[in-house]
Amino acid sequence: EQQTQADAPGGQALSFWQRILLADSALLAQAAAGHTDSGTAEETTPPEEIGETPNLSPITPDKVEERTLSGSGTEYVNAQGISLFNRTEKTVDLAAIAQAGSSLHFQPAEAGPQILILHTHSTEAYAQDSAAPYQESGTARTTDPSYNIIKVGEEITRIFEEMGLRVIHDTNLYDYPDYNGAYERSKAAAAQYLAQYPTLQMILDFHRDALVGADGTVYKPVLQIDGVKTAQVMLLVGSDDAGAVFPDWTEHMALAMELQQQMNSLWPGLARPITLRTARFNQQMTKGSLLVEVGSHGNTLDEALAGARLFARSAAKVLLTRVG
């Protein structure tokens, strides 16, 4: 697709997907126009949340387009069987990160819970289904845990526990009624869990993505797996690029790389490229913290649950090797 200098901050041309990402973030859209909010080294709230509101236009079926995202564009780093979308100023050596690995280690399940699953943006939901409509609190948002991202977390918790991992699933709402400040609220809750359960070594923050083109087209990441329409899953890794202290972010990247490889070895195409961001997203709290995006607001809940089940089964295989 044709690119123009005006598409990018600093006069650099942006790809199709980068323009979608700009459209999706209020802060990044400000940056594109030359207006940004600056942070400090002490800033703990991810910059993406400062002043951001979850405003999405209503979804109409004729504006939804299916895509399977593979990371084949020039903006992606592909090495070691890994695909990465690097949205920082860092030069990332995937081979060196893979070699150094992650020090994540769990005590046996009998000792206590190992993983905390939560949802900073708890009301994030999926496309409306005429057969099972839900009451919206905003476009593709609902406080009903049977239809929002909490339902996805419930399914992942079930499979993790079925496979032998011990999980706490936090079903509290952190983005309602007030969206801004959600990361501070989920961080405070996570700190309480960590204090109460010292065996917790991993925090997984599950979200759903939102991919919207400049013309209003909603893109949903999806593929067919064993005849089932399945939402793709994206791992998001934070960093210290925005100035906050996060010296071991590369360990989180190494873990994400393991998970991406496992997903795509079992179900090719299930994992979208890993995204590396400038903010920490509270991932500094444990060695195993990651943010996971299951589908987007264009996907149906059934598609998201299909992707969540496969993610859970593949991730559990990796995580169980770190027990003992």
Regions flagged by a language model, labelled:
Residues 7, 11-120, 125-129:
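Non-catalytic propeptide/linker segments at domain boundaries
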Residues 101, 110-113, 198-201, 228-232, ...:
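Extracytoplasmic
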Residues 122-125, 173-177, 208-213, 240-243, ...:
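Solvent-exposed loop/turn segments at secondary-structure junctions
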Residues 128-151:
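Glycine- and acidic-residue-enriched helix-capping/strand-helix junction motifs
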Residues 136-139, 211-247:
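A short, glycine/acidic-enriched catalytic loop
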Residues 143-222:
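Catalytic-core regions of hydrolytic enzymes
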Residues 248-275:
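Active-site-adjacent substrate-binding region
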Residues 271-324:
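Active-site-adjacent mobile loop/cap segments within catalytic or ligand-binding domains
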